[in-house]
C-alpha cells in the first residue's frame, strides 16, 4: 500500500503538526492567499491558508460556538451583528441561530474564500448564506469599520493569525474602527491565538484594545487542531458587567434562545473567562 501524502503546518519553526492527506479537493493561490482543502480520515475536510490550519469539519463547532454564543448571550439583546472574515460560513451559521438578531453583515477580503467554501465546506455554512438577514461585503476589514455608516451591537473578528492579509486585523486602526461602529454597550471579540505559544499576540491586543475600551479581557476554549493548547479570544466592551454575568443569568438567556449546542453551555461560558496564571501575570506586568 502506498504511503499517504502528508501536509505539514508551517505556523511554527521548531515544532508543529501534520495531517495525512487522503484527497486534495482544492488548491489554488488567489490574489491574497494560498488556499487548500483536503480530506483527512480523522478530521474530515481541512482548510488551510498560507500553511496554517483554519478549520476542520470535526472540531470547528467548538471555535464557532464560543466566538458567537458567548458575546451574543452576554449582550442579551443584540440586533445587529458584524462578522469580519468568516468566509467559510460557520460563524454566520451560528449567528443565524439567534432569532432576535435582525441583520448580519459579513466583511470578507477575498471573494474566492466564500465561493470555494460554499462548494467544498457546505457543512460549515449549512445554508446560512441564504438567510434573508445576511449581507456579504467584499472589502478590507479595516477599511470597512472606518468608513461604514452602520453600527453594530456585536462585532466578531474571525481573523487569521497576524501574518499576511490577517495582520491588519490586529492593528490599532482596526480596533479604533470597531469602537467607532459599535453601539453603546456593544461587545467586540476576536480570535487571539494559542496563548501558551502566542502569548505576545494576547499582550499586544490587550494593550491596543485598552486604548479604546474600558473593559478588556480574554476567554478561552480548547480546540484540538489549533496546535499548542488553549485558544484565546479577545473581549472588549465599555460595559464591564457583561464579562461577569452570573451563570444563572446566562442560563436563563440560553434556555430562552432555544439553542442546542455541542460544546457551549452556560457553565462553560462562565468558566471560559478564568485565565491561567501565566497569562494573568503576563498581562499584569505590562505598563499601563
UniProtKB/Swiss-Prot annotation:
One of its GO terms (molecular function) is spermidine synthase activity. It is found in: Cytoplasm. Pathway: Amine and polyamine biosynthesis; spermidine biosynthesis; spermidine from putrescine: step 1/1. The active site is at 158 (proton acceptor). PROSITE patterns: PABS_1 (PS01330), PABS_2 (PS51006). The keyword Transferase applies. Residues 9-238 form the PABS domain. Spermidine binds at residues 64, 88, 158-161. Its EC number is 2.5.1.16. Its main location: cytoplasm. InterPro entries: PABS, PABS_CS, SAM-dependent_MTases_sf, Spermi_synthase, Spermidine_synt_N, Spermidine_synt_N_sf. It catalyses: S-adenosyl 3-(methylsulfanyl)propylamine + putrescine = S-methyl-5'-thioadenosine + spermidine + H(+). It is an enzyme of class 2 (transferase). One of its GO terms (biological process) is spermidine biosynthetic process. Keywords: Cytoplasm, Polyamine biosynthesis, Spermidine biosynthesis, Transferase. One of its GO terms (cellular component) is cytosol. It comes from the Bacteria. S-methyl-5'-thioadenosine binds at residues 33, 108, 140-141, 165. SUPFAM superfamilies: S-adenosyl-L-methionine-dependent methyltransferases. HAMAP family: Spermidine_synth (MF_00198). Homodimer or homotetramer. Belongs to the spermidine/spermine synthase family. PANTHER family: SPERMIDINE SYNTHASE (PTHR11558:SF11), SPERMIDINE/SPERMINE SYNTHASE (PTHR11558). Catalyzes the irreversible transfer of a propylamine group from the amino donor S-adenosylmethioninamine (decarboxy-AdoMet) to putrescine (1,4-diaminobutane) to yield spermidine. This is Polyamine aminopropyltransferase. The lineage of its organism: Bacteria, Pseudomonadati, Pseudomonadota, Gammaproteobacteria, Enterobacterales. The gene is speE.
Amino acid at each position: 500500500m502506498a504511503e499517504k501524502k502528508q501536509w505539514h503546518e508551517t505556523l511554527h519553526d521548531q515544532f508543529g503538526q501534520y495531517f495525512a492527506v487522503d484527497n486534495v479537493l482544492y488548491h489554488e493561490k488567489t490574489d491574497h492567499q494560498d488556499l487548500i482543502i483536503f480530506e483527512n480520515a480523522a478530521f474530515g475536510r481541512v482548510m488551510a491558508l498560507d500553511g496554517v490550519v483554519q478549520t476542520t469539519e470535526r472540531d470547528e463547532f467548538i471555535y464557532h460556538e464560543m466566538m458567537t454564543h458567548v458575546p451574543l448571550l452576554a449582550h442579551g439583546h443584540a440586533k445587529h451583528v458584524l462578522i469580519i472574515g468568516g468566509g467559510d460560513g460557520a460563524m454566520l451559521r451560528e449567528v443565524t441561530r439567534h432569532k432576535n438578531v435582525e441583520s448580519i453583515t459579513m466583511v470578507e477580503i477575498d471573494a474566492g474564500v466564500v465561493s470555494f467554501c460554499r462548494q467544498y465546506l457546505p457543512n460549515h455554512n449549512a445554508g446560512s448564506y441564504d438567510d434573508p438577514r445576511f449581507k456579504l461585503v467584499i472589502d478590507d476589514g479595516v477599511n470597512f469599520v472606518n468608513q461604514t455608516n452602520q453600527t453594530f451591537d456585536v462585532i466578531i473578528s474571525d481573523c487569521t493569525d497576524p501574518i499576511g492579509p490577517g495582520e491588519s486585523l490586529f492593528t490599532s486602526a482596526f480596533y479604533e474602527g470597531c469602537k467607532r461602529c459599535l453601539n453603546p454597550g456593544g461587545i467586540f471579540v476576536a480570535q487571539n491565538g494559542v496563548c501558551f505559544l502566542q502569548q505576545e499576540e494576547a499582550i499586544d491586543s490587550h494593550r491596543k484594545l485598552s486604548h479604546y475600551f474600558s473593559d478588556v479581557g480574554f476567554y478561552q476554549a480548547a480546540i484540538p487542531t489549533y496546535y499548542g493548547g488553549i485558544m484565546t479570544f479577545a473581549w472588549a466592551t465599555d460595559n464591564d458587567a457583561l464579562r461577569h454575568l452570573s451563570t444563572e443569568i446566562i442560563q436563563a438567556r440560553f434556555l430562552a434562545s432555544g439553542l442546542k449546542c455541542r460544546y457551549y453551555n452556560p457553565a462553560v461560558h462562565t468558566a471560559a473567562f478564568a485565565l491561567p496564571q501565566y497569562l494573568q501575570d503576563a498581562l499584569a506586568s505590562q505598563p499601563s
